[in-house]
Structures are given as structure tokens and as C-alpha cells.
Amino acid sequence: MASAKKNKDINHNSLVAIKPITDNQKVVFDTWKKGKNQFLFGAAGPGKTFISIYLAMQAVMDLKAKPEKVILVRSLIPTREIGFLPVDEEDKAALYQVPYQNMVQFMFEMPNEQSFSNRYDRLKGQGTLYFLSTSFLRGLTFDNAIIIVDECQNINFHELDTIITRVGQDSRIMFCGDFDQTDLQKTNEKNGLHDFLRILGEMEEFNCTEFTIGDIVRSGFVRSYLINKIKLGIGME
């Protein structure tokens, strides 16, 4: 296993060292190192998805660790029923992968500009990274993998239940989401994530971290906007 990881074009040698910026990020780094699965939720902009992908990449590129691949899972809302579109699955999902393409570029040392622009595709090509829609998970088992479920506020309880029961041997899972950014319309679907969090909160295998406005690292502009949005009570359900 170590030899296979070492011989991949993109490996641990090019992964940059990234340290936590906020206290809550440090909690995630520390509990992940102790073997905990993660449920990260709260304000937009604290780096939930970024640090999840980084920690996952760090794990799968560790020559001594058993996980061999990162699997990004996301619901393709508002087009959940993407099977009706006359294109293949990769084309349908391409738009939803743009944020991850941007993120992974900053996790690795780049010898040239071309390497910077195609890093995501090369990780997929060498079998280190996969992207899957929630529509295509039933019946699968993920062994030797780190599963990252992003934008999980757009996934109902039934789908969350399906996803977490895909976790196989020598695998771990991370959930990232923001209750305030859900695209789900029905109350019972929105409540599904809250119920799911209650279950994970009882599991010793999980660390659940809520990020607040004070954790925002995207920009001071975003922090100011959210502070005033909350102060005025606008867009709050």
C-alpha cells in the first residue's frame, strides 16, 4: 500500500503544511488526529469544506495510513433527478465540482501554472479523488476511504442514512453543512439533518463542531454581512 501511494504522480511530497487558524478549526484538527469522524456545521466561510478535504488528503497520502482515496459526496440540488438530462453523469456533476477544483489547488506545491490548473483532474485520474452524487450510492460500500459529505443541509434524512451506512472497513466520514443555507423546501426534510445530528452527537466515534461568525476566515466582508443580517433578523426562519 505504501509503495502504491508513493508511486502516484501526486503524493505526500507535494502536499503543503496547513495549520488551523481558529480555535474551532484546531478542535477539528485535533479530534481528527485522534481518530474521530467529523460533523462540521454553522456559519458560511469558516473553511469547513477546505479543512475537511485537506485532512482527508493528508490521511490518504500518509504512507502508513490505510485509507487510499477521498470520496466527495454531494446532492445535486436543485437537479436531484439528473437522470433525465441527455448528458452523462460526469457532465451533469461538473458544475458542482468547481469549488473543489479551486480548493485542492492550494493544498499542493505547484511546479508550474499548468499543474495548478489541472491538479483536481489529476487527483481523480490517479484514483486518489472521486466525486459522487447522492443519487448513485445505494448498494455501494466504501472501504479504505475518507468520505466527505458536503452541503449536507441539502440532503434529507433518508439520504443521510443511506450515505453513512456505506462506510466500510478502514474508512472514515466527514459531514459539512450550514442549516441556514438549505435548498430543501419541506419542513420534515429540513428537520432531517437536525435529527441526524442528534444521532451523531450520541456516538463516541464523532466530533461535532459548530462554527460561528467569529470563525469566518473567508473575509471580513462576509463576516460583516452576516453580523448585520442576523442583527436585522433578515432571511432567518
Which residues make up each language-model segment?
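Pre-Walker A adenine-sensing motif
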Residues: 17-35
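Structural recognition of the conserved hydrophobic beta-strand(s) that form the central parallel beta-sheet
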Residues: 72, 131, 148, 172-178
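Interdomain "pre-motor" coupling segment immediately N-terminal to P-loop NTPase/helicase cores
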Residues: 1-8
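Conserved nucleotide-binding/hydrolysis micro-motifs of P-loop NTPases
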Residues: 45-46, 75-80, 137-138, 154, ...
